[in-house]
């Protein structure tokens, strides 16, 4: 028996990292799943891993910057399993590490589309099904950067702060329908996205700097974010709503800004 038996969940960005960990954890706990990712090869690999725990999985290539594709993933999942209990809006792209004065409008629009509009689409098209189901759980993945400044990441942090604010408003507005809405704000997690940021930084010290920012002396694991998502998706989290769950190794309570980040010009790199 799993804590998500008889529940149906949609999870985006399952090809790797946090989204993959959440989808696998949900499958182990008995959920039926609708999963999406823009990378069909990674999506296929995750789907095969999910099937080790359950055959109840609907897999669909999904570009979360497209409202039509997000809606299709949700609709197909409901058509297959008859209802929706949980939505996890997970996809993010890391663009930053330099001042916003060096950020192109194209980069800004990309961050908005993937990190914010995707969350809006997921919530917009899942809420009618959650209402019909007499309730459910919305889980939006934000970031610890919405809580503590890190030079060079103002655009990313601002949008993640917007995700938190929108989620709190959804919790208030749709609470009367027994719909809970929460965010999870991870610290630095061992994911492909973090690996990309470290590689693009080029100093060779960024990973060590990230570790020093966390009082626990390490970066986190995707499975540790997934464990929080399982709680919020389950009946154990039935009274949790409108909250931001920081899973950050204590970073926010002891903020340590990395010297020099954001002090360089992207155009001079």
PLM region descriptions:
Residues 98-100, 107-112, 210:
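Substrate-binding pocket helix/loop in short-chain dehydrogenase/reductase
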Residues 120, 218-247, 252:
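C-terminal substrate-recognition "lid" of short-chain dehydrogenase/reductases
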Residues 143:
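Residue(s) in the substrate-gating loop at a strand-loop-helix junction
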């Amino acid at each position: 028996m799993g804590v998500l038996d008889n529940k149906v969940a949609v999870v985006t960005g399952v090809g790797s990292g946090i989204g993959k960990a959440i989808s696998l954890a949900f499958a182990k706990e008995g959920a039926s799943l609708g999963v999406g990712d823009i990378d069909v090869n990674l999506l296929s690999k995750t789907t095969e891993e999910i099937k080790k725990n359950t055959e109840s999985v609907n897999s669909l290539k999904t570009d979360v910057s497209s409202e039509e594709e997000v809606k299709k993933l949700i609709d197909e999942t409901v058509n297959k399993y008859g209802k929706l209990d949980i939505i996890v809006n997970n996809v993010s792209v890391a663009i930053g590490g330099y001042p916003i004065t060096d950020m192109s409008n194209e980069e800004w629009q990309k961050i908005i589309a993937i990190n914010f509009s995707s969350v809006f689409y997921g919530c917009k098209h899942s809420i009618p099904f959650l209402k019909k189901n007499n309730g459910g759980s919305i889980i939006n993945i934000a970031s610890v950067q919405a809580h503590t400044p890190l030079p060079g990441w103002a655009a990313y942090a601002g949008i993640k702060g917007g995700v938190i604010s929108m989620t709190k408003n959804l919790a208030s507005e749709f609470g009367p329908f027994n719909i809970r809405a929460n965010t999870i704000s991870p610290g630095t997690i061992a994911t492909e996205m973090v690996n990309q940021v470290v590689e693009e930084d080029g100093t060779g010290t960024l990973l060590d700097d990230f570790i020093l920012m966390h009082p626990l002396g390490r970066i986190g694991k995707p499975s540790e974010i997934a464990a929080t998502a399982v709680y919020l998706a389950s009946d154990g989290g039935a009274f949790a709503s409108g909250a931001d769950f920081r899973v950050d190794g204590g970073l926010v309570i002891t903020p340590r800004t990395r010297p020099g980040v954001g002090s360089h010009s992207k155009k001079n790199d």
